């Protein structure tokens, strides 16, 4: 059998597949940390592993910090993130967006990374007052919103851009509020 330059991924070892996926997750997180206007490479290869991991980490930390009904807190965070991303994506599609459903959900999911970091920071130092929590989470909300605008802002016609961005801001605001009230 002749080895090709691009082997079939079904033939590669599991560890190689996991490392390749982790590398792609890191690449996408890098673009969220340092948002740039050119997001074509990030949007081309969408995945849902990174958003799932970020959502699970956020939901776990918020449910751990809940005093009562930890399972309910986990469920609320998980449902708000995924249903909210789906609703915002459908809104973008209805406004003649030019990216696919899963590309948009992928980007919205990766852009919760700053809010996930804020959740972990607030969980580590649990005695934060609201005065300290608000700037941390507010900065994470702005960062998430700014990063997602860099990806999704150009996918909608300019005349409808505000109609597409406003629900994204609300989506991240709801998630930020869940982090603040933990």
From Swiss-Prot:
InterPro entries the UniProt entry points to: Yip1/4-like, Yip1_dom
Residue ranges that the Swiss-Prot or TrEMBL entry lists as coiled coil: none
One Pfam family here: Yip1
Stretches assigned to the Lumenal side: 67-70, 126-133
Cytoplasmic topological intervals: 1-45, 92-104, 155-161
GO cellular component: Golgi medial cisterna; Golgi membrane; Golgi trans cisterna; trans-Golgi network
The organism's place on the tree of life at top rank: Eukaryota
Transmembrane segments: 46-66, 71-91, 105-125, 134-154, 162-182
GO biological process, one term: endoplasmic reticulum to Golgi vesicle-mediated transport
Family: Belongs to the YIP1 family.
The name this protein goes by in its record: Protein YIPF6 homolog
Source organism of the structure: Dictyostelium discoideum (Social amoeba)
Gene that this sequence comes from: yipf6
């Amino acid at each position: 059998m002749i080895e090709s330059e691009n082997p079939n991924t079904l033939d590669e070892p599991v560890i190689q597949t996991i490392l390749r996926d982790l590398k792609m997750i890191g690449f996408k997180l890098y673009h969220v940390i340092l948002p740039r206007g050119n997001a074509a490479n990030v949007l081309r290869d969408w995945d849902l592993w990174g958003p799932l991991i970020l959502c699970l980490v956020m939901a776990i930390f918020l449910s751990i910090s809940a005093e009562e009904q930890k399972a309910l807190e986990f469920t609320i965070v998980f449902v708000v993130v995924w249903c909210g991303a789906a609703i915002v994506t459908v809104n973008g599609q209805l406004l003649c967006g030019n990216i696919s459903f899963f590309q948009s959900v992928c980007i919205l999911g990766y852009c919760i990374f700053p809010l996930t970091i804020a959740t972990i920071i607030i969980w580590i130092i649990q005695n934060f007052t609201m005065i300290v929590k608000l700037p941390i989470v507010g900065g994470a909300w702005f960062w998430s919103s700014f990063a997602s605008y860099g990806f999704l802002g150009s996918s909608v016609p300019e005349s409808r851009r505000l109609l597409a961005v406003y629900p994204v801001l609300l989506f991240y605001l709801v998630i930020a509020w869940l982090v603040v009230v933990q």
